[in-house]
């Protein structure tokens, strides 16, 4: 069986279970694909080639294990998640030499399920960015056009999946960082409900917003990975202690969209939405209607305020979370400081990038005694209103549907000098994180002007990932496949 990297995760998993393919063959095929594509897309920061081959050989020697749903499947992980014995930098120079001794909960779950971790994916520094150009090490390029961005902050993960370097990757979503790069790279990305997946071992950006989720090539694959990483973990006090649904069974039980009410908020379809994105997304809605869905209008009136509220809340939490990187306990340490203050200032100035410093300063400002009420308290009030908007909308629909990004992938460097314009790229994704609800991004076509992937997002009720996945699976199967990335042909 040749070109294994072109298979879905479900297909390679089944081939491995039947011993039609060895785990070592799957790993070697992905490593060969990485060797071919990595010089063009720069999706990886750390590669575990030798370790992955050894792990695959050990699995082959033991034989397939039906109790391990990812047995022998090669995957990658965003570099914000700790991996025992493998560097974890969060895309930052300040953690350049950090090698953790423990796995993040989600990584631990992958290993227990039999997955083989090939490497760690590039990302915007501390997950602060929308293009993966804020990485301290290198920008990642979009496999569909290597002159364009892959999105962010999980751009490395999206690029790896789209390029066939792995069968799945774990990303993180604080304000759209799974869904947006999935949309721009033409793959599937699931942002779970806040608390569905433990954040233990995740290098924090915004602790009340961060969530870990799968990035794959099909909705079925996302359901498989989600079933592995979801679950309670007592080491994360925000992790929900509730049963995990059988997501695969949810997919199998739905064959059309009869009886499904899809809400369409006008706020997601107005000014700023490019015509090619609107065209592709409306075609997907037409396909949903043909499958039996009922399209209803809903309102999310506080969507315009979500950008300001998000950047106040997220920056405030980041300023607290990143205070620990001071050059004293761990991380980059300035050389020959004159005194303690010089150590602090130089370690952080040299170790943290411009965007991270910008958000730390913003967060410190909005939390200061003179401005807390004017900014942070108001942002918290807007956040509650946004959650109320979603609750009201779900009174009349089962899922909400809209574009992920107002535009397709833009050229590298086009927005780096204009951070405010970059922030606007997340206008359709931020509110979901503020509400703590789940969202699924899936590709719906290629832009008529740019030829780049367009994604649509399905938004759901709290802990109702099963509905999102089952609806998304039916819809995605009815849409024409995108084909292989044009930039790598």
From Swiss-Prot:
Heterotrimer of A, B and C subunits. Its EC number is 6.3.5.7. Keywords: ATP-binding, Ligase, Nucleotide-binding, Protein biosynthesis. This is Glutamyl-tRNA(Gln) amidotransferase subunit A. It comes from the Bacteria. Allows the formation of correctly charged Gln-tRNA(Gln) through the transamidation of misacylated Glu-tRNA(Gln) in organisms which lack glutaminyl-tRNA synthetase. The reaction takes place in the presence of glutamine and ATP through an activated gamma-phospho-Glu-tRNA(Gln). SUPFAM superfamilies: Amidase signature (AS) enzymes. The keyword Methyltransferase does not apply. Gene3D superfamilies: Amidase signature (AS) domain. GO terms for biological process: translation. It holds the Pfam family Amidase. InterPro entries: Amidase, Amidase_CS, Amidase_dom, AS_sf, GatA. The active site is at residues 78, 153, 177. One of its GO terms (molecular function) is glutaminyl-tRNA synthase (glutamine-hydrolyzing) activity.
């Amino acid at each position: 069986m040749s070109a294994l990297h072109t298979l879905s995760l479900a297909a390679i998993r089944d081939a491995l279970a039947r011993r039609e393919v060895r785990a070592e063959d799957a790993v070697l095929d992905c490593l060969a694909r990485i060797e071919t594509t990595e010089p063009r897309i720069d999706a990886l920061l750390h590669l575990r080639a030798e370790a992955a081959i050894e792990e695959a050989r050990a699995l082959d020697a033991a034989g397939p294990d039906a109790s391990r749903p990812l047995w022998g499947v090669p995957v990658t992980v965003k570099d914000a998640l700790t991996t025992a014995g493998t560097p974890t930098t969060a895309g930052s120079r300040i953690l350049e030499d950090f090698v953790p001794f423990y796995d993040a909960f989600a990584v631990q779950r992958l290993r227990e399920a039999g997955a083989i971790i090939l490497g760690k994916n590039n990302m915007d520094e501390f997950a602060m960015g929308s293009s993966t150009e804020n990485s301290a090490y290198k920008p990642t390029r979009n496999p569909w056009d290597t002159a364009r961005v892959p999105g962010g902050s999980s751009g490395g993960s999206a690029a790896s999946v789209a390029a066939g370097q792995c069968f799945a990757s774990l990303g993180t979503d604080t304000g759209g960082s799974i869904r947006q790069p999935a949309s721009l790279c033409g793959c599937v990305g699931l942002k779970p409900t806040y608390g569905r997946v433990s954040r233990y071992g995740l290098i924090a950006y915004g602790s009340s917003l961060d969530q870990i989720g799968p990035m794959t090539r099909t909705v079925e694959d996302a359901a498989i990975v989600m079933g592995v990483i979801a679950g309670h973990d007592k080491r994360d006090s925000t992790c929900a202690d509730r049963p995990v649904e059988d997501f695969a069974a949810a997919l199998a039980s739905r064959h059309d969209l009869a009886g499904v009410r899809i809400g369409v908020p006008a706020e997601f379809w107005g000014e700023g939405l490019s015509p090619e994105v609107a065209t592709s997304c409306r075609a997907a809605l037409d396909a949903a209607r043909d499958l039996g869905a009922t399209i209803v209008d809903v309102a999310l009136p506080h969507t315009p305020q979500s950008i300001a509220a998000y950047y106040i809340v997220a920056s405030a939490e980041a300023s607290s979370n990143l205070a620990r990187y001071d050059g004293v306990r761990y991380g980059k340490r300035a050389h020959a400081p004159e005194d303690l203050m010089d150590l602090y200032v130089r370690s952080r100035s040299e170790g943290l990038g411009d965007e991270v410093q910008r958000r730390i300063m913003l967060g410190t400002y909005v939390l200061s005694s003179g401005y807390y009420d004017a900014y942070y308290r108001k942002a918290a009030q807007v956040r509650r209103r946004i959650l109320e908007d979603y609750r009201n909308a779900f009174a009349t629909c089962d899922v909400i549907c809209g574009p992920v990004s107002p535009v397709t992938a833009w050229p590298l460097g086009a927005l780096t000098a204009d951070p405010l314009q970059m922030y606007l790229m997340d206008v359709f994704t931020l509110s979901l994180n503020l509400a703590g609800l789940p969202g699924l991004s899936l590709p719906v076509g290629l832009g008529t002007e740019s030829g780049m992937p367009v994604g649509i997002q399905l938004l759901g009720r709290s802990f109702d990932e099963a509905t999102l996945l089952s609806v998304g699976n039916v819809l995605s199967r009815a849409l024409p496949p995108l084909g292989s990335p044009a930039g790598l042909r």
